[in-house]
Amino acid sequence: MTIEKLDGTSPRLYTLVAPLVMRRSVLRQNNNYPFWTSRSHTWFVAWEGETVFGFVPVEITDGGVAKINNYYVSGDDPRLLSRFLREIIQYYHRDYTIRSM
């Protein structure tokens, strides 16, 4: 499985996550709160073949914070969530304070 890092407005991001974020079942897991993105976001997307298994958008704030506001992991797989967190920590820990809301 690959975890790909994508800019928040990348056309590839939309191609990968649109089928998930438009599903009612995925939105329910996010308390019916829509997923959103911007140029301030970087998304970590786990995929293999034609299947996306999850994603974690990270927003960089003016205060030097890498903020995780929501995520989706298929089947609530704790191993995949841990892998996402390791990737995010490795990428941001030197330059940003990492916070999850």
Model region roles, listed by residue range:
Residues 64-76:
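Conserved acetyl-CoA binding element of GNAT-fold acetyltransferases
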Residues 92-101:
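Conserved GNAT acetyl-CoA-binding A-motif
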Residues 40, 62-64:
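Short acidic/glycine-enriched loop/turn segments that link adjacent beta-strands
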Residues 1-30:
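Short amphipathic alpha-helix that is part of the acyltransferase structural core
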Residues 45, 50-59, 67:
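Conserved beta-strand in the GNAT
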Residues 76-93:
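Conserved acetyl-CoA-binding loop-helix of GNAT-fold acetyltransferases
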Residues 24-47:
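Active-site rim helix/loop that mediates acceptor-substrate recognition in acyltransferases
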